[in-house]
């Protein structure tokens, strides 16, 4: 995927902040500190387009990125972070739910899980919602460079079994921001949907 001009557009803290346009959008969803921002940066070949942090819960808004005036990447706040006040969690939940349920040009979702661990209950709830919505989805298991080659098949089976993916026509790929593995697969998932999008 060749990208010439990726640019940050806005950090949306409320529905009124969402940008108005007719391009397809691709949401990146996952729990806190799973590597959403790093995946976006790798995808667009920019180290600091999406802000990354070792501190979970850093992304507190929905961040919109315009890619070559062709489509948008949307970085959703991470879920499942314990050390956040309940009221803040509820606001994040309201914002995320409002975006996912009411964004007519949402063309696809990249659901991110950690390749090293069994998906959480929150991951399963999110995937169940995606299944019910019918929105095209790619499951990206990040940080695959941190597990051995020999354990990959076992981890893939664990992820697919936990998320009940056998009855789901979504795609799956391992991903590493460090090595670039999976970048081509994520890019193809997005571009195929851009080409078929009718807003």
Curated annotation (Swiss-Prot):
InterPro entries found in the cross-reference section: G_ENGB_dom, GTP-bd, GTP-bd_ribosome_bio_YsxC, P-loop_NTPase
CDD domains xref list: YihA_EngB
Alphabetic keyword roster: Cell cycle, Cell division, GTP-binding, Magnesium, Metal-binding, Nucleotide-binding, Septation
Binding-site list for Mg(2+): 37, 59
One MF term in the entry's GO annotations: GTP binding
Cofactor(s) listed: Mg(2+)
Cellular component, GO annotation: cytosol
Gene3D superfamilies attached to this UniProt entry: P-loop containing nucleotide triphosphate hydrolases (3.40.50.300)
Annotated binding of GTP, by residue: 30-37, 57-61, 75-78, 142-145, 175-177
GO biological processes: division septum assembly
Domain EngB-type G per the UniProt entry, residue ranges: 22-196
Family: Belongs to the TRAFAC class TrmE-Era-EngA-EngB-Septin-like GTPase superfamily. EngB GTPase family.
Function: Necessary for normal cell division and for the maintenance of normal septation.
Name this polypeptide is given: Probable GTP-binding protein EngB
Organism: Halothermothrix orenii (strain H 168 / OCM 544 / DSM 9562)
């Amino acid at each position: 995927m060749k990208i010439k001009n990726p640019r940050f557009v806005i950090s949306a803290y409320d529905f009124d902040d969402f940008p108005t346009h007719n391009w397809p959008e691709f949401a990146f969803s996952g729990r806190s500190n799973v590597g959403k921002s790093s995946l976006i940066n790798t995808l667009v070949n920019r180290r600091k387009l999406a802000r990354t942090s070792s501190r979970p819960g850093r992304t507190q808004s929905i961040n919109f990125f315009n890619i070559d005036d062709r489509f948008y990447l949307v970085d959703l706040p991470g879920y499942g972070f314990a050390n956040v006040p309940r009221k803040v969690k509820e606001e994040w939940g309201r914002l995320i739910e409002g975006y996912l349920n009411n964004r007519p040009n949402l063309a696809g979702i990249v659901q991110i899980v950690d390749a090293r661990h069994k998906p959480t209950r929150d991951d399963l709830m999110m995937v169940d919602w995606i299944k019910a919505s019918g929105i095209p989805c790619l499951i990206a298991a990040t940080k695959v460079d941190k597990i051995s080659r020999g354990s990959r098949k076992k981890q893939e089976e664990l992820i697919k079994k936990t998320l009940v993916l056998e009855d789901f026509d979504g795609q799956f790929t391992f991903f590493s921001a460090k090595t670039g593995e999976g970048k081509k697969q994520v890019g193809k998932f997005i571009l195929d949907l851009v080409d078929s999008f009718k807003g």
